[in-house]
Amino acid sequence: MKKTIVLAYSGGLDTSAIIPWIKDNYNFDVVAFVADIGQSKKDLYKIKEKAIISGASDCYISDLKDIFVKKYVFPMLKTGAIYEGEYLLGTAIARPLIAKAQVDYAKKINAIGLCHGSTGKGNDQVRFELAYSALAPSLLVIAPWREWKFQSREDLLKYLKTKNIVTNVNKKKIYSRDENIFHVSTEGGILEDPWNPANEDCWFWTKSPLNAPNKPKKISLKIEKGCVVSINNKFFNEFNCLKRLNKIGAKHSIGRIDIVENRLIGMKSRGCYETPGGTIIYKALRSLEQLVFDRECMYWKNKIALQLSSIIYDGKWFTPIRKSLQKSSDILSSSISGKVVVELYKGSVRILQKKSLNSLYSKKYVTFGKDNVYNQIDAKGFIRLFSLSSRIRALKNKK
């Protein structure tokens, strides 16, 4: 009986080529493992058949949609993690869950190893293999992009042709696309030159701002402990909440970014990322934090968010430091409850209204009109003490 490898299978060009390549070079059976994390249903319907045609002995589809949003996406959004000021980590946050589910399935069927289709130039190879190391250090890991002779996706197309395996990718439209319920990314093709403008082929979900509605859209979000629980007074679970906001946001061109980012391994890469629902939630949560957090809480929350963004981007999900920082962030976010009204218009998210029972904002204290709660003379003593070190230094230098 042949030994079995479990491949994290997407149905795309790379993983379709990996199946026959492993059979040719390792003489292992390949079981394709597909994580359903909310990508297009149209793709999922065809994916099992495609895996078998490509040579897989079996294809297992694991429904991870709800757990992905509930245990990964929403907790991350609550932290405020955002990489290099723009990227909401839509691909990075999916990798730990896919790897964990893949490992669990490999153990269940007594497979001897794991395989992924990440390139030797990218971040995902690190993310997958850090998770494998944390969860199943004894299993064999195969990373074909670091072994095979193919140098490009064009080479893969030629290889699949020799195997009589049909793919819907062609040389003119050779983008690498990654999709889940939270985010879709497009890389490669014309995007490899930063001087090339991204055309509409590079955008998969969202309408162009030019074609978005001319009338702004207002939506009301209820937030409890850092999580959106209702949209326009209709309650949804986490998955359906994100799905609904994606639909609304995509129509209004929300969540498009075209960025050059610093990869973990040292090089820069360019991608077009779409995160419509996530962008709306991110903006709403940060807006409510402005009402609720004092200066010190805001400082530490932002610092934790910055650290977590790198930890998640680098694939260090299954580490004590990620768990510790996230727990700290959860404690801070326990007071983030309230209501936010946002306006969506041709790619922009504008906060119109916000309120919270935990708000530290006091109109009585900040009014420019007459008030009876704040004695402005008190500021004199505060400033004198606050400037003490500066005055001592100045007096010393004067000597």
UniProtKB/Swiss-Prot annotation:
Residues reported to bind L-citrulline: 87, 123, 127, 176, 185, 261, 273
CDD domains recorded: ASS
EC numbers on record: 6.3.4.5
Binding sites annotated in the UniProt record for L-aspartate: 119, 123-124
Name the UniProt record assigns to this protein: Argininosuccinate synthase
Subunit note: Homotetramer.
InterPro entries per UniProt: Arginosuc_syn_C, Arginosuc_syn_N, Arginosuc_synth, Arginosuc_synth_CS, Arginosuc_synth_type_1_subfam, AS_cat/multimer_dom_body, Rossmann-like_a/b/a_fold
Species whose genome carries this gene: Buchnera aphidicola subsp. Cinara cedri (strain Cc)
Domain of life assignment: Bacteria
Similarity section: Belongs to the argininosuccinate synthase family. Type 1 subfamily.
GO MF, any single term: argininosuccinate synthase activity
Top EC class, one word: ligase
Cellular component terms per the entry's GO annotation: cytoplasm
Record's subcellular location: Cytoplasm
Pathways involved: Amino-acid biosynthesis; L-arginine biosynthesis; L-arginine from L-ornithine and carbamoyl phosphate: step 2/3
A single BP term in Gene Ontology: urea cycle
